[in-house]
Amino acid sequence: MLLLLGLCLGLSQCVGSQEEAQSWGHSSEQDGLRVPRQVRLLQRLKTKPLMTEFSVKSTIISRYAFTTVSCRMLNRASEDQDVEFQMQIPAAAFITNFTMLIGEKVYQGEITEREKKSGDRVKEKRNKTTEENGEKGTEIFRASAVIPSKDKAAFFLSYEELLQRRLGKYEHSISVRPQQLSGRLSVDVNILESAGIASLEVLPLRNSRQRGSGRGEDDSGPPPSTVINQNETFANIIFKPTVVQQARIAQNGILGDFIIRYDVNREQSIGDIQVLNGYFVHYFAPKDLPPLPKNVVFVLDSSASMVGTKLRQTKDALFTILHDLRPQDHFSIIGFSNRIKVWKDHFDISHSRQHQGWQSVHSPYVAHWRHRHQRGLAEGHQAPQQVRGPQWHWRPERVPHCLPDGWEAHGRGDAHPQDPQQHPRGRPRPSLHLHIGIGNDVDFRLLEKLSLENCGLTRRVHEEEDAGSQLIGFYDEIRTPLLSDIRIDYPPSSVVQATKTLFPNYFNGSEIIIAGKLVDRKLDHLHVEVTASNSKKFVIPKTDVPVGPQKAGKDVTGSPRPGGDGERNPNHIERLWSYLTTKELLSSWLQSDDEPEKERLRQRAQALAVSYRFLTPFTSMKLRGPVPRTDGLKEAHGMSAAMGPEPVVQSVRGAGTQPGPLLKKPYQPRIKISKTSVDGDPHFVVDFPLSKLTVCFNIDGQPGDILRLVSDHMDSGVTVNGELIGAPPNGHKKQRTYFRTITILINKPERSYLEITPSRVILDGGDRLVLPCNQSVVVGSRGLEVSVSANANVTVTIQGSIAFVIPIHLYKKPAPFQRHHLGFYIANSEGLSSNCHGLLGQFLNQDARLTEDPAGPSQNLTHSLLLQVGEGPEAVLTVKGRQVPVVWKQRKIYNGEEQIDCWFARNNAAKLIDGEYKDYLASHPFDTGMTLGRGMSREL
């Protein structure tokens, strides 16, 4: 499947290059004009954007992987240049975020619903791109942009994936293909498994798309520069090759796949159950069980399209598989071209009984197989050129089917094949079908639908690859069935919204995963009952699993990443549950033939994907406008519009192109900055929008004082404190203070805090994350977004309804009375409650009125004189019934970018604020108590 996101920034790409190419072919153009153009073109090719950094950070916790890819580019040319970011990701993964930084503009991805009407068109395009460009088991993400001359760009891609256990190992693959050598290239993988890590290996870099058979694979060790640190439950793997080491691997920058395989410890019991914040996951993978007998039918395309290498490789693989069959196993081979032929098996005399048993199912099985594929072609493929001759004589696309199951078959039942519960004891059960498509023109969507209808698996083999070894590898995954008809039950009073609990087969080396919600978060024990068939006997183990007290979730990703819409939920088990549920809804939608049912499944899958920020066939990604820097804050007031290109986004999983012009267009800022703020030494400004009044005041605090700026701990859960620092000694004659630290505490939905200084941002939501302020980055953690614009400002967005902007004021050569310091602006207060308090928070929902008219006609001379010193006439302001004397002043905000008129309240805002200045002093930066307002008790 091709994963494509086209982001067209700026004017039409390569216009100049196209014109030059046309001019070269013009016979009337003089040779003297051609040479300079050719030289210029060669220079452009030589000075293509330089990739300064390519890094991948992945965190795997309990099989669930969070991965963030960061790529930074530099345009060294004297003109704008096109650049493309390309990344291969696992086909099973969901993209959760994409962010671009072009120059100083930040474009943030947003997952939205996809319009249903474009589904048919998109489906065709998706199939085409998948077949032509898609890697086996991977999707390709592409994003293009235009980098201004001498400027930088950065791309951040985040995706999530649940690792599947195959052949006794979990495999985590990271594509390292930056397309050029990079001075800073790194892959950092953290693995956290509470059950304990039983084995861990890093494979050599793999540049082939094939998975391999797992038999006798290369064991030459990890790539050079790989460092592995491991203990019982945690492992850290770092791959950080130098430019020389990269060049030895591949001079074109296509290093290959960095692959980690590991397994965990298991107890011989009901399985491993983990619980966190009301969600649970159950890993079930028993071992040391006797294998079940299996019946294998190979359905092979014997038409002319298979003649040659593909047929030879397939035959070699089948002979290898036949030698692997156990004495109790049965097999048959069915070939088809324009007719169907059944080859009877030729076991030795000891297998004659099994041979006779198989003969009884040949005819009905062939009929069932033919009917299934005819219906699949009619519904999923609809390609008339693939139907030849009579109605049931058809030619599929080079598709060999390997069809094993875990039961003895003595006929075919009428029950629906994918529901094992519809096959009671003693009744024949359906086969498990392994559908393998060989070639680049396989209709993979058809195979997926057939697999879902028959509880099967689907695999792809490309023509240029070693099909034989891959066929053996696919067979190895299902060669040893241990259980059948597995059903896992939990008490309905304890568990709701569980994922699939019925499974037709369990194979050695695989794993069954179930996730769901707990009704009672304080549950001590969870009753689990497993019903399964093992070699003609039904096994029913029951037990009460202790779940213990549940701890608060942690942000396990621990890496700087774009996001901020909560897509990286600290509760990894909740994310795992949403991932599995979405996958099952998509599979049910693909399998269903009932239109009302398909629409219901589509709506459920779409709603869940939007809620958890998953990019699926039913959702698309759009880019929000750029986040303004401090030096561009005036744009929010309409003084100047930021001219930027409107990106055109194509859904990565098949959504149509979003409408939008390619020409430049003014952007609406994502956040409209209000005047309610505190900055400088420290100067407070509060807005009363209902009265169209702006009031300002100063607080003359002492160095070390911690001021309560916003206090809404009891309602929205947000508290903001600011710590003062004094001017250097022997400086200005007046004592000056500035904010050196802004602390933001969030109590809902999870407790976390931010500590911001002019040099760094510390984010602690369970795991500690330190961001330098001299680098632009966007990170997020369940409803909290932190956007750092290098040496300019920090924007904090909480639950999408609260936003703060903290400007960073740095001085190259500070005067004696200057210090590096911070400001604080309330950009969005919608999510703060009416009970919000603090030096700034108390004014967010209040009104004020001016009770005396300033500067009457007889006061014009006095007014003019006062204007010369920056002050105007006095008046009386009424706030909360209190009379506050104020004087008209002019004050600069936004680091001097804008000058405002305000009414100034003297004496530390006496009578303007509730209580006194000392009532707003916090005992420490993380104090959430308040002596004023509704929260009278002080909480430490």
Curated annotation (Swiss-Prot):
Region Disordered: start-end pairs: 117-136, 208-227, 405-432, 541-571
InterPro entries: ITI_HC_C (IPR010600), ITIH (IPR050934), VIT (IPR013694), VWF_A (IPR002035), vWFA_dom_sf (IPR036465)
UniProt keyword terms in alphabetical order: Glycoprotein, Protease inhibitor, Secreted, Serine protease inhibitor, Signal
Compositionally biased spans, kind Basic and acidic residues: 407-417
Glycoprotein among keywords: yes
Main location: secreted
GO biological process: hyaluronan metabolic process
Annotated VWFA domain residues: 295-478
GO MF annotations in UniProt: serine-type endopeptidase inhibitor activity
Stretch forming the signal peptide: 1-16
GO CC aspect terms: extracellular region
VIT domain ranges (all copies): 35-161
Localization in the cell: Secreted
Glycosylated sites: N97, N127, N231, N508, N774, N793, N860
Keyword Nucleotide-binding: no
Pfam families: ITI_HC_C, VIT, VWA
Known role: May act as a tumor suppressor.
Protein family membership: Belongs to the ITIH family.
Protein name per its UniProtKB record: Inter-alpha-trypsin inhibitor heavy chain H5
Biological source species: Pongo abelii (Sumatran orangutan)
Gene name linked to the record: ITIH5
